[in-house]
C-alpha cells in the first residue's frame, strides 16, 4: 500500500459519504511542500455534511492519528498531510535495494495477452520518421504492459497489399532496373513510386493501368505475384536492419495480404446476421445507432473488399489466435473514424470483446512546420537520421569524456535513445516538429540528459565501491532527498497511469523529473563525504539509478554505465 492509498484508507474510515477509491482520486500534491506532502480538499463533502469545507477539514485533521504522518493539519478547506520522512525513506530504500529492477513490478494483467498492432510500414516505401512514432510508442507500451503482468504480442501489420502495388508494377515495368533495385531496394522503389504518381497527375491512363495490374495481382497472375513477392522480400530485409538497430522485435509480420483469404468469411457472417445493406451497388453496415453517420463500406460495387473488411478479418483472427484481454492499434489519429467503425461493426456482429479494442492515436511529425508526404518525396528517412544522431552524440561524448573506452557503442545508445525519447516525451496525441539538434542535446528535457544523470550516479557508486545491503538500515529526513524519495515511491503509480492512458510520455516526464531532482540533490549534497548519512545517501543514489534505468527501459532506451 503506497502513502496515498494509506491516506485514502484512513480517511474512508471516518468519511461516510465517500469510498476509498473516490477519496484516492481527490488527493492532491501541494505545489508548495511547506503545505504538506499530500492534501485532501474537503469541498466535495460540504453539500452532504451541510458544513463549510473549512470546518470539515478541521474536524478530519483532528480525527487522523496514524503513526505514518509527522503531522496532519487543516489549512482552510484542505487537510494537509506531512509524512514521516525517516520512516518512508527507510521503506522506499529498503524496497528498491531488495527488489532492484523488479521494483514496481505488478501482476495486474495476470499473464493475459495484450495484442499491439504497431509500426506497420508500407512495403516498397522507405521507413520514415512517421512510422517511427507507431514503432516506439507500441514498443514502449509493450514494456509497460509486461511490467504490470501482461504478456504482449507485437504485430507488424505490414502494408503489403493495395492499389499502390499496381502503380509500382507499372512503374517498374516502364522504368525499372533490376540491378539498381537489388542494390538499393527502397531508394529505387521510392523513386519509381514518386515518378509514377507525378506522371499519373497528367496521364489518367496510368491510373487505369495500375488498377488493371492490381486486379491481376488479386486474381493470382504469376508475373504480378512474383513482382509483388520480390518487392516485399527486399523491403523486409531493409526494414529488419532498421528494427535491429532500434532493438525492436515483433511476434508476427502478418500484414494485409495475410487476410486475403479470410475476408469472404467476414462477409458471410455479416450476411448471415442480416447486417449487410445494399447502397448504390455496394454492401454496407449501417452504424447510425452508434452515432456514426457514415455506414461501414464492406464491399464495393465491383466486388472489391475494403480496409475495414480486412481489419474485421484481422480482429477475428487475433481474438481466435491470442484470446487477448486487450487489442491495441497504435495508428495515427487520422484513422480515428475508421477504428470507431471497426468497433461498432464488431459490436453489431455480437462480439462483446469489441470493448477490449482500443485505438491509440498519435499526432503528426512535421519538419519546419510542414507535413511530410511519401508520395511527394517529402520525407525524413530513418536510416540517415539515425546515423546523424549517432554522429552528433559521439561529438558530445568526445568533448565530455575523451578517454571513454567504447565511444561508438555509447554514441549509438545515446543517438538512438535521443530520437526515441524525444518522440515519447511528447503527449501521444500531440505532434512535434522534428529537430535533431534539440533531440541529441545533453541539456534540457532530453534522453541524453536522463542517460547522463544515470551514468553520473554510476560513477559515484563506483568511487564509493557501494554495494547495497538488502537489510541496510537506510533512512534520510532532509528536504532535498525527500523530493527524490517521493518520486521513487510514486513510480508504481506512474507506470499504472501510463498503462491506463496508453501514454508513454507519463514515464518520460517522470524520468526527466527524477533526473532533475537528483542533479539538484547532487549540487547541494556532498554524497561521498564521511558522515552518518553517507550510506543512506549512497543508497538513495543507487535507488535513483535503478529507477532511472527501469524508466528508460520501459521507453525502449538504453542506459549506458559510462558516458
UniProtKB/Swiss-Prot annotation:
The keyword Protein biosynthesis applies. A motif ('HIGH' region) lies at residues 121-131. The keyword Nucleotide-binding applies. This is Arginine--tRNA ligase. GO terms for biological process: arginyl-tRNA aminoacylation. Keywords: Aminoacyl-tRNA synthetase, ATP-binding, Cytoplasm, Ligase, Nucleotide-binding, Protein biosynthesis. It is found in: Cytoplasm. Coiled coil: none annotated. InterPro entries: Arg-tRNA-ligase, Arg-tRNA-synth_N, Arg-tRNA-synth_N_sf, ArgRS_core, DALR_anticod-bd, Rossmann-like_a/b/a_fold, tRNAsynth_Ia_anticodon-bd. Its EC number is 6.1.1.19. It catalyses: tRNA(Arg) + L-arginine + ATP = L-arginyl-tRNA(Arg) + AMP + diphosphate. Belongs to the class-I aminoacyl-tRNA synthetase family. PANTHER family: ARGININE--TRNA LIGASE, CYTOPLASMIC, ARGINYL-TRNA SYNTHETASE. It is an enzyme of class 6 (ligase). Pfam families: Arg_tRNA_synt_N, DALR_1, tRNA-synt_1d. It comes from Streptococcus pneumoniae (strain Taiwan19F-14). Monomer. GO terms for molecular function: arginine-tRNA ligase activity; ATP binding. One of its GO terms (cellular component) is cytoplasm. Gene3D superfamilies: Arginyl tRNA synthetase N-terminal domain, HUPs, Isoleucyl-tRNA Synthetase, Domain 1.
